[in-house]
């Protein structure tokens, strides 16, 4: 057997030792992985994670509000950072329960986790950050450095931590890029030097196995060879023939025999040791001087290592390397004498290859470690942090400890990290440069090119060319040019020609006579000239109606279709001062004998330009007489050939040559504009006319007029007589005669030239464009681009939008955008006229800036003079429109600048119809701008010292709170009609013969969606909570920061105090304890106010101050705490705590107000009792409405039969619900002279209740007292209470179809009758108060007969009225007997005082009512009525006495 401890270069020995080293490395890696998992397991243990452990043990109910507040504050700070962040490589991934996850991308993604302290922002220390390790990603070293700094710093915030991490990451990227460029230059120089050395080196031929490799690889191999030789030395002194030793070496774990340091440490040490060495090393395959080393030396060196290991199991790198270096030096001193064979050489080559593989693996690990070291080197000196002084601090930055700086900045690292850093950085740069850029370019370019261009070009062209154009050519043009000419030439035209020629010219000219005739007959200006004489008008009407009726209708229909497609909507725009500043000359064209070319607009006489405000173009020219009205008033010109009634408003501007004049309103259709026109225009002062032919798009007709029209027969002039006889033949024209005349005209003109539309630029004759004569005032916006942006915005899903979209389900996005484009066009045209401009913000028509100039205001207003004096160009208003809800939801209007006095900004933002429940969809943006003008004229004024100040952000939050809660702080009431969108008109039309809620006759009718309503209320409350929270945060910053903001006046003029009154009056404690977080937020909004804000609590809004409201609420809190005395503290401790906090706050507030020297004490109030009996009744019986009383529970025995848990204790949830409702009863029960509800409950057992309802006026129950008992079952409030009536004449009287003689009350809310879902009992919503109000208003009514099922159909009939009267007479009699006399004689226990006061004060009214009942009673019952009346009078007199 070959000796195991043979020569160092023995192949077998080397293989074993190589396996030995390989085994050491594998064991090291395995132990490292095991150690890593042990660490992770310890970190995941909840006992070692204090934050997670505490979160699990704490009660979620107690921490719910804190978590919500903490999460909201963190989100606000992150939103601030995102607004300023410009680095796209840094993004927020998630936010969850104080954990923030960041993503930093530079070639590869780094996931950073930031943990906030539990009580943040109250606690601003204890932050931590770490990088989540991912595969093939080298961690960022500055993250661990930052984590060390976070643990020792105080007064930190999420915003600052994220900001500095992002700044550090940006610096890291810059430094890494600069380092890469330097390394590349350095590598080039080293490669050149190495190439020169290689050319000079000579390899010895005496060593055939010598291998030349890369310098760095050679260093690695030599270093491993050193390690192998050291291991060989340790084993040379052991005898080879010892079986025990040999067995021990083979069987024992190799890791126990020799201690080998971490390979990564060895490589790093090798780098430093070989830094100054040569770049080329020879590897010897054989050596004559090689031999075994001294056994004593090997044993001593091995013992040194083992001795150190025993003392310190974690050997330091320096100690191990020093031992290895010493032993290596000793080995070099001794020469090997054992020659090697060829087999040894081959084995050595294999060994070298294996060593190279191991070195490469070590090299990869070295690269990662070195890059981490480079990061530390880059940021070791640049990252510093300054400890903030106290609470006021600005910024901080990371600081690297001194020890870390000394370790990371090592000179030998430079050479070793040259090549690895290059490889890593090159890959990083390529990823960043290649992938994101290509994706962005492809997506954006292709979408824009494909979508916008193709859609617009295809749709617009096809619709105009195919549908509307062809029909007009076939029907309208040909028929009108053939048929009307014949009739006019024979009869109708004769009279017209005579009048027109005589009036217009002294010497008739054929050309002048011909063309007006053709125009007047076919296009109908005839009425204007002939209107003065009745005979001529009659003659002209009939032929036009008979001949031109059908063609005109067809043409009009087609044009209307085209107009809808082209023009979005009819505009109601008033007249501008001028349509154009100058006019252009038309293009020259050919002319004939009967027409003259227009070469200069100055040659034109007096005429009118027709302007269409919808399209923004001039559509024609009109020539005619100016009306007799004043020149500055609008007049209407109607085309007589428009029989369809489809009219449209245009404007006429008078021109003389090219000089514009006055403007008139014009109404008509485009029918007239679809034909070429020959117009006579008077020239300057010479009494002559010039005839011009206009066609569409400024093209003059080139063809000659037919001879039959140019040279009319002489009989035309001779036969013109203004005699009525000529009218008769016109009316009696037969169709056959008309056909023959038409055929003859066609034959005559068959071979002659006529006016041909194909000769013009627009062959179909759809448009007349006089753009060369006039300047078009087009809208200076790209409407197509605005439309595309609006469509994209409308198609996006908005998850923050929680408003109901029920009315928009059938309203398509395209229609909504078209509607908005219309309003935008209207707004622009109105602004041109009234002196304001509009600017879409980022080409978004749903976000508009309105710039109001001084001309927008009345010149006698204060604000107008202030703008002139202070040289203010405009007032900026912003209008934001909800793109998903428009026009069914109001826009948001805000004043941007300047600051205007008298709280104008709040008035503008809270105009009455801008509230959601008062919005009218018919109100346009133009209406809103007009109301803004009225507000500015009435209230606007500027303070030269304050007008440049910007509005504080808290102002906008207060406006939002006003709009959400409906608390209007504005003194302005708009003239616009405000409507209720609750479909009241529809409900009135339904034929209902019963009172809603009684439980009868609802089969087949529509029902309201309770779940949808509940969801809407929930969303609204959430928005209110978020808005109020922002106000509290900003108000706290203003108060603590002592900012120079007049917050007191802002709060006084806003809805803040009215809203708090609304919360504590209408909301009451019953609603507030349902949401403790909201209750606490409202309480905090008052607790943060200092003594300077005390006048706000004393200011009276609607005759009541906030202090008075809080005083009553404080009493309710005392009462509520008393009702909870039977409940364990743990069951409702949160409610008790928040109520006690309020009571403590109110105590401090009242104490501060007592010391306030500017107010009077609230106790010095004078109680004024009105002489009016109604006020006396309310004041006297106000204290009788709600009282405690020890009720006789035995009388409720018949109501307990239906309770499943009669003898069991009441559930704590039911007790809490009843306690809350009792608070509501104390302030919400009605006490009125007409009808009241008086309530008693047992303080010992609040499940038992009694109440009396006094009968409403004008009913058969008037002023009677009706007694009820109510019991809350064990399942309350999930089920309705049990109600029974006791005023039944001892079970003999039924007062109402819903009130039975046995005491049963039939109502759908009580589950005793079927009803709609919204009328049934709804847990958590319905209450005992609702039950009592339902009985008062829906059962005790004026006509109870119709509450009977089946009788409602007879309402309004004679029979039904008669039966109802008879039923009421019985009810009146029983009301006197049992609800008045019996109650006075036998008052209900607990209501004695109330009954006496009630009948005493209402005695005169009761006597009068009962006397009326007697008079209306039937004769056979009057005596019985009289007996009851006499007895009642005696009882009433005794009470009054």
Curated annotation (Swiss-Prot):
The active site is at residue 1306. InterPro entries: MC1_sf (IPR036620), UBQ-conjugat_E2_core (IPR000608), UBQ-conjugating_enzyme/RWD (IPR016135). Residues 63-89, 340-368 form a coiled coil. GO terms for molecular function: ATP binding; ubiquitin conjugating enzyme activity. One of its GO terms (biological process) is DNA protection. It is found in: Membrane. Keywords: ATP-binding, Coiled coil, Membrane, Nucleotide-binding, Transferase, Transmembrane, Transmembrane helix, Ubl conjugation pathway. GO terms for cellular component: membrane. It holds the Pfam family UQ_con. Residues 180-199 have a biased composition (Basic and acidic residues). Its EC number is 2.3.2.23. Residues 539-549 have a biased composition (Acidic residues). Its main location: membrane. The keyword Cell membrane does not apply. Residues 1217-1380 form the UBC core domain. It catalyses: S-ubiquitinyl-[E1 ubiquitin-activating enzyme]-L-cysteine + [E2 ubiquitin-conjugating enzyme]-L-cysteine = [E1 ubiquitin-activating enzyme]-L-cysteine + S-ubiquitinyl-[E2 ubiquitin-conjugating enzyme]-L-cysteine. Residues 180-207, 283-305, 505-554, 577-605 are annotated as: Disordered. It is a single-pass membrane protein. Residues 286-303, 505-538 have a biased composition (Low complexity). Pathway: Protein modification; protein ubiquitination. Signal peptide: none annotated. The chain crosses the membrane at residues 20-40. PANTHER family: (E3-INDEPENDENT) E2 UBIQUITIN-CONJUGATING ENZYME, BACULOVIRAL IAP REPEAT-CONTAINING PROTEIN 6. Belongs to the ubiquitin-conjugating enzyme family. Catalyzes the covalent attachment of ubiquitin to other proteins. This is Probable ubiquitin-conjugating enzyme E2 R521.
């Amino acid at each position: 057997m070959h000796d195991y401890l043979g020569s160092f270069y023995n192949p077998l020995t080397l293989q074993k030792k190589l396996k030995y080293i390989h085994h050491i490395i594998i064991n090291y890696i395995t132990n490292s992985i095991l150690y890593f998992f042990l660490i992770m397991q310890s970190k995941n243990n909840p006992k070692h994670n204090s934050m997670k452990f505490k979160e699990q043990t704490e009660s979620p109910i107690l921490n719910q509000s804190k978590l919500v507040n903490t999460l909201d504050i963190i989100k606000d700070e992150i939103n601030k950072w995102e607004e300023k962040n410009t680095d796209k490589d840094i993004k927020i991934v998630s936010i969850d329960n104080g954990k923030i996850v960041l993503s930093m991308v530079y070639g590869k993604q780094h996931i950073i986790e930031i943990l906030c302290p539990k009580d943040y922002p109250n606690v601003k220390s204890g932050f931590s950050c770490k990088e989540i390790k991912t595969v093939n990603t080298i961690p960022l070293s500055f993250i661990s450095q930052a984590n060390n700094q976070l643990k020792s710093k105080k007064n930190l915030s999420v915003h600052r931590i994220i900001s500095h991490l992002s700044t550090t990451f940006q610096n890291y990227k810059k430094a890494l890029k600069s380092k890469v460029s330097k390394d590349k230059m350095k590598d080039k120089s080293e490669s050149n030097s190495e190439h020169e050395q290689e050319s000079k080196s000579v390899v010895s031929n005496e060593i055939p196995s010598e291998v030349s490799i890369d310098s760095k690889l050679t260093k690695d191999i030599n270093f491993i060879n050193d390690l192998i030789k050291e291991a060989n030395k340790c084993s040379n002194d052991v005898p080879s023939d010892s079986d025990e030793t040999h067995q021990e070496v083979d069987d024992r774990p190799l890791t126990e025999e020799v201690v080998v340091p971490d390979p990564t440490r060895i490589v790093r040490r090798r780098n430093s040791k070989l830094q100054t060495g040569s770049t080329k090393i020879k590897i010897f395959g054989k050596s004559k001087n090689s031999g075994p080393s001294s056994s004593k030396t090997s044993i001593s060196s091995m013992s040194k290592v083992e001795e150190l290991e025993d003392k310190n199991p974690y050997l330091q790198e320096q100690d191990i390397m020093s031992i290895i270096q010493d032993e290596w030096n000793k080995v070099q001193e001794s020469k090997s004498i054992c020659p090697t064979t060829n087999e040894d050489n081959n084995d050595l080559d294999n060994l070298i290859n294996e060593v190279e593989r191991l070195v490469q693996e070590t090299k990869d690990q070295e690269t990662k470690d070195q890059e981490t070291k480079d990061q530390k080197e880059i940021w070791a000196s640049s990252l510093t942090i300054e400890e903030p002084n106290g609470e006021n601090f600005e910024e901080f930055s990371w600081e690297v400890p001194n020890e870390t700086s000394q370790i990371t900045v090592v000179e030998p690292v430079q050479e070793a990290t040259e090549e690895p850093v290059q490889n890593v950085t090159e890959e990083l740069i390529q990823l960043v440069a290649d992938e994101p850029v290509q994706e962005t370019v492809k997506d954006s370019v292709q979408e824009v090119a494909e979508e916008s261009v193709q859609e617009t070009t295809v749709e617009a062209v096809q619709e105009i060319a195919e549908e509307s154009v062809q029909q007009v050519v076939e029907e309208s043009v040909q028929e009108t040019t053939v048929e009307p000419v014949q009739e006019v030439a024979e009869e109708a035209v004769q009279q017209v020609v005579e009048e027109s020629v005589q009036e217009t010219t002294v010497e008739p000219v054929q050309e002048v006579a011909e063309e007006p005739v053709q125009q007047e007959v076919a296009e109908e200006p005839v009425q204007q000239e002939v209107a003065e004489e009745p005979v001529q008008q009659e003659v002209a009407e009939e032929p036009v109606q008979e001949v031109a009726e059908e063609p005109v209708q067809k043409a009009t229909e087609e044009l209307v279709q085209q107009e809808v497609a082209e023009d979005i909507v009819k505009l109601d725009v008033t007249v501008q001062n001028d349509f154009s500043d100058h006019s252009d000359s038309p293009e020259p064209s050919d002319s004939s004998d009967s027409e003259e070319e227009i070469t200069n607009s100055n040659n034109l006489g007096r005429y009118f330009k027709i302007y269409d405000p919808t399209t923004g173009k001039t559509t024609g020219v009109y020539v005619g007489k100016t009306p007799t009205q004043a020149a500055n008033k609008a007049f209407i010109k109607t085309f007589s050939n428009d029989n369809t009634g489809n009219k449209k408003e245009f404007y006429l501007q008078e021109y003389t040559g090219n000089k514009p004049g006055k403007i008139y309103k014009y109404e008509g259709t485009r029918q007239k504009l679809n034909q070429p026109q020959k117009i006579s225009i008077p020239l300057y002062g010479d009494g002559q006319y010039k005839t011009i032919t206009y066609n569409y798009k400024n093209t003059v007709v080139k063809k000659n007029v037919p001879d039959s029209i140019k040279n009319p027969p002489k009989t035309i002039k001779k036969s013109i007589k203004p005699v009525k006889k000529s009218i008769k033949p016109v009316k009696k024209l037969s169709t056959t005669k008309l056909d023959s005349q038409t055929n003859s005209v066609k034959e005559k003109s068959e071979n002659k030239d006529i006016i041909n539309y194909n000769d013009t630029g627009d062959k179909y004759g759809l448009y007349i464009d006089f753009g060369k004569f006039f300047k078009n005032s087009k809208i200076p916006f790209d409407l197509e681009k605005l439309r595309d942006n609006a469509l994209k915005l409308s198609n996006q899903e908005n998850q923050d939008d929680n408003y109901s979209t029920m009315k928009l389900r059938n309203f398509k996005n395209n229609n909504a955008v078209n509607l908005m484009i219309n309003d935008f066009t209207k707004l622009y045209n109105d602004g041109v006229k009234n002196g304001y401009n509009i600017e879409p913000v980022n080409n978004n028509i749903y976000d508009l800036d309105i710039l109001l100039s001084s001309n927008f205001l009345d010149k006698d207003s204060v604000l107008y003079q202030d703008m002139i004096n202070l040289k203010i160009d405009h007032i900026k208003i912003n209008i934001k429109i909800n793109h998903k809800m428009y026009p069914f939801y109001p826009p948001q209007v805000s004043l941007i600048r300047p600051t205007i006095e008298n709280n104008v900004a709040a008035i503008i933002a809270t105009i009455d119809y801008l509230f959601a429940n008062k919005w009218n969809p018919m109100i346009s943006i133009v209406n809103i701008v007009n109301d803004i003008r009225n507000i500015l004229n009435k209230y606007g004024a500027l303070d030269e010292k304050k007008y440049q100040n910007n509005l504080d952000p808290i102002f906008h939050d207060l406006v939002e709170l006003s709009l959400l809660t409906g608390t209007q702080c504005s003194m302005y009431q708009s003239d616009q009609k405000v409507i209720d969108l609750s479909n009241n008109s529809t409900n009135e039309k339904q034929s209902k013969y019963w009172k809603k809620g009684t439980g009868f006759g609802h089969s087949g009718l529509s029902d309201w969606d309770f779940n949808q309503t509940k969801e809407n209320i929930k969303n609204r409350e959430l928005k209110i909570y978020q808005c109020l929270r922002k106000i509290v945060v900003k108000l706290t910053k203003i108060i603590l920061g002592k900012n120079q903001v007049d917050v007191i006046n802002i709060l006084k003029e806003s809805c803040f105090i009215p809203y708090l009154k609304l919360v504590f009056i209408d909301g009451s404690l019953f609603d507030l304890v349902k949401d403790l977080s909201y209750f606490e937020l409202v309480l905090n909004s008052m607790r943060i106010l200092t003594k300077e804000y005390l006048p706000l609590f004393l200011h009276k809004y609607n005759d009541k101050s906030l202090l008075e409201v809080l005083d009553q609420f404080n009493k309710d809190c005392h009462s509520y705490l008393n009702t909870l005395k039977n409940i364990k503290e743990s069951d409702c401790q949160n409610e008790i705590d928040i109520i006690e906090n309020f009571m403590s706050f109110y105590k401090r507030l009242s104490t501060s107000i007592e010391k306030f020297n500017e107010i009077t004490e609230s106790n010095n109030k004078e109680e004024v009792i009105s002489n009016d009996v109604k006020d006396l009744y309310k004041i006297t019986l106000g204290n009788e409405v709600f009282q405690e009383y020890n009720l006789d529970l035995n009388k409720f025995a018949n109501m307990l039969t239906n309770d499943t848990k009669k003898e069991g204790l009441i559930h704590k949830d039911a007790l809490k619900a009843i306690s809350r409702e009792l608070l509501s009863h104390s302030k919400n029960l009605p006490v009125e002279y007409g009808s009241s509800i008086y309530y008693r409950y047992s303080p010992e057992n609040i499940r038992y209740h009694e109440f009396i309802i006094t009968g409403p006026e004008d009913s058969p129950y008037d002023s009677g007292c009706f007694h009820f008992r109510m019991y809350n079952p064990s399942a309350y409030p999930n089920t309705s209470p049990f109600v029974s009536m006791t005023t039944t004449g001892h079970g003999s009287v039924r007062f109402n179809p819903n009130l039975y003689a046995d005491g049963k009350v039939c109502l759908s809310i009580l589950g005793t009758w079927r009803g709609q879902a919204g009328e049934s009992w709804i847990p958590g919503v319905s209450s005992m108060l609702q039950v009592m109000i339902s009985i008062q208003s829906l059962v005790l009514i004026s006509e109870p007969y119709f509450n009977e099922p089946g009788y409602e159909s007879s309402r309004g009939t004679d029979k039904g009225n008669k039966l109802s009267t008879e039923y009421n007479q019985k009810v009146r009699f029983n009301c006197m007997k049992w609800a008045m006399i019996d109650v006075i004689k036998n008052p209900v226990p607990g209501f004695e005082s109330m009954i006496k006061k009630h009948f005493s004060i209402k005695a005169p009214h009761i006597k009068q009512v009962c006397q009326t009942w007697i008079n209306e009673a039937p004769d056979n019952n009057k005596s019985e009525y009289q007996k009851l009346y006499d007895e009642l009078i005696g009882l009433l007199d005794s009470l009054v006495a």
